[in-house]
Regions:
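Enriched for short, Lys/Arg-rich terminal
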Residues: 66-67, 71-90
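Flexible, active-site-adjacent loop/turn segments at secondary-structure boundaries
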Residues: 46-47, 58, 81, 87
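Absolute protein N-terminus
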Residues: 1-2, 90
Length: 90
């Protein structure tokens, strides 16, 4: 399977890194590595995580405060968003 980070998800990652990195650069890097690690594992087990709140999506709790939303389309896994758990989605 092919893994694709959609533009909004990449933008989310940058904003999260900037926000956390302002106070704790090391924590920001560790969290971003966790996003990358979870995403990289998806092609092996794409349906491992729970169905999302939006039909056709799945959600990974990467950290108690952050959820990664993805969708599977054919042979492609699209990372759609990386959101704070308290954020309203959709």
């Amino acid at each position: 399977m092919i893994l694709v980070w959609k533009p909004l998800a990449l933008e989310d990652r940058v904003q999260i890194m900037e926000f956390i990195g302002a106070d704790n650069p090391l924590a920001a890097i560790e969290l971003d590595l966790a996003f990358e690690s979870k995403a990289d594992a998806l092609p092996a087990h794409p349906t491992m995580y729970k169905p999302g709140r939006v039909k056709g999506t799945r959600e990974i709790v990467v950290h108690p405060n952050y959820v990664m939303v993805y969708a599977i389309t054919g042979k492609t896994i699209n990372i759609l968003r990386v959101l704070h758990a308290a954020r309203q989605w959709p």
